Amino acid sequence: MKMQLMDLKKQGIDIQENIPLSRFTFTKTGGPAQYLAFPKNLDELKILVETVKTNNLPLTVIGNASNLIIRDGGISGLVLILTKMDKIVANQEEATVTADAGARIIDTSEAACEASLSGLEFAAGIPGSVGGAVFMNAGAYGGETEFVIKSVRVLTREGKFKTYTHDEMEFGYRHSLVQETGDIVISATFGLEPGDKWAIKAKMEYFNGLRRAKQPLEYPSCGSVFKRPTGHFVGPMIIKAGLQGKRIGGAEDSKKHAGFIVNVGGATATDYLDLIHLIQKTIKKDFDVDLQTEVRIIGKEKD
């Protein structure tokens, strides 16, 4: 298997071995990828998917790794990072923006603004990729990815291209169909509304101002860790439980925004997960509320 993957490297595909994924995650934590590839186009992506399928090798796809915790043992098999696939095309006449999965959702919202198209303002400060935003149904400030998705193009694990309509994506709170199917998002088309460019820009700047004021952007983090339980707010519960500012190793529940766990220096994924579990256990005991993680947690424990 190693020989086959390295042969792909000779063909010009960027593929590496035993690379620490902490280099790519927003938390600056995570163990190594057994193999790591950065496909530049659909042809390379298809070759990689077919190679791992033929050899029965595990396949993991990540985007900008902004809402992701990778355990300290890393990930076996092949990890694909799609950030080199980042084309964005705005069509003012059709009021759409189509973006590759590896494009940043921030850049996609800015492209919409430049084309005087409204609907993606909420995404102006979300640090993830388009693929990640679709996968997680990312949202902020009353906006959700599902509100503006027109269609999603994917590559199935069998190596077939397929397009889903909005309704076929089965969006829910931080959920989409591709979480169940394992399909790889390769692009998304957003259906937007014509608007005033300067009003759109002002709204984006307003949301970014709120983000800077309320979120601990000065530290590495994976953003909001927990889903909001029905009838409750996570931050106030954490504060009432006395856990704001709680630190395990280098992971700390942010003093600026309870519910954000930041890397204040030298944190490991285990530190993050231990703090998450402590918060979940305490909130269950104090409030009888089961906190579910919003952040995606993957990989294996360190031996």
UniProtKB/Swiss-Prot annotation:
Chemical reaction(s) catalysed: UDP-N-acetyl-alpha-D-muramate + NADP(+) = UDP-N-acetyl-3-O-(1-carboxyvinyl)-alpha-D-glucosamine + NADPH + H(+)
Protein name per the record: UDP-N-acetylenolpyruvoylglucosamine reductase
Main location: cytoplasm
Function: Cell wall formation.
Family: Belongs to the MurB family.
UniProt KW keywords: Cell cycle, Cell division, Cell shape, Cell wall biogenesis/degradation, Cytoplasm, FAD, Flavoprotein, NADP, Oxidoreductase, Peptidoglycan synthesis
GO biological process: cell division; cell wall organization; peptidoglycan biosynthetic process; regulation of cell shape
Enzyme nomenclature, EC number: 1.3.1.98
GO molecular function, one term: FAD binding
Species lineage: Bacteria, Bacillati, Bacillota, Bacilli, Lactobacillales
Catalytic center residues: R174, S224, E294
Pathway this chain belongs to: Cell wall biogenesis; peptidoglycan biosynthesis
Domain annotation FAD-binding PCMH-type: ranges: 28-195
